[in-house]
Amino acid sequence: MSSSISGFSKLSKAEKIQWLRLNYLPDGSHKILEQFWSSDNAFQNVFENFSENTVSNFHLPYSIAPNFLIDGTLYAVPMVTEESSVVAAASAGAKFWLKRGGFKTRIINNLKEGQIHFNWAGEAQILEAFIRTNIESFISACKNTTSRMEKRGGGINTITLRDFTAIEPQYYQLKVQFRTADAMGANFINSVLEELADFFSVRLTAETNIEPTIIMCILSNYTPDCVVESMVQCKVSEFDDKNAEYYTDKFQKAVRIAQIDTYRAVTHNKGLMNGVDAVAIATGNDFRAIEAGAHAFAARDGVYKSLSECTVEGGVFTMRATLPLAVGTVGGLTRLHPLAKLSLELLQSPTSEQLMSIIASVGLAQNFAAVRSLVTTGIQKGHMKLHLSNILNEMGASESVAESAQKYFESHTVSVNAVRDYLNEK
């Protein structure tokens, strides 16, 4: 019989599991939770402190995609994902471009944004004049929080007022842009915003006799001014395909479709983000924030479309991906998680901008490999071959039967039904 509980967070791990056993778990299934604990207690404690109410660890494969030549540097890129074919596709894309110049990147900008949302009942012109004349004092008021970041080249970049009163009475916003050096900067930005809001409220009230109502202070995960571009380029004749011009034309058209059709664009970008997320997770970055920002960026013109584009002009194939990436190489999980720390070492201890370039290039490699597969062999042929092991495991195939199935399906189409039929005959 399941029941609600008060004070669950105060229970020990053993007590939490006991409560789950009594209320939700079938007999004996709690042992699965224990199987994934680390035998090293200190190591296990690190993991348990990442989140709340922890009762076990959830493992994901940690993989390597080699042969990434990015801005002249060769990388073996760590990727964390449970999805079949993602790492294989990224690796295939990296290998293809390794001998064709690799990936060239540029950081378009690296500004991040936070916002102070407030209501104010005075005249907009008075507020605008107040902001203009007090920007320097606003920045100075936050020095206790920003001084260390400023020594690393970061800090407050701009402060501007946004007026929303035409659509929401008395509602304004202070838009504050930051540079956060090699940190993702979420905690830093939020701390500065709260400190600034206190000073702003007191100063505005003193000068105008009208007190603002601070609604909230929070960073934005939409970072259209923290953007990286990754690009690949080669002659059409350098493609291995027999009918290179025919296939590169199809390729260009496939990417173009993702520019004009939202249904295709969502799946197209999902494939690109497979690579982005996998490297973000491996390096301890917030893939959910990255996902949210990327998809908002894809719809920045009012229509959701592809994050990548492709041209074939004068016998030259060019593909590029442009996306916002607010990532860090210091602070947070990047240093707390042993594998996140190792990932950054594998990537030769990159700066945050270098990590932006790496992640964008993996996303582009992923996207290139997926589209190439779509316009040549079709997505299922490669994906289902790589997914075969998962199907066999799910159906309980023995090691010897699984081995024979792998050989059989080298020359046969893979599907769940086909695998089931094969196993039934054994």
Region locations from a protein language model:
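Glycine-rich anion/phosphate-binding loop at the beta-strand->alpha-helix junction
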Residues: 189-204, 209-339
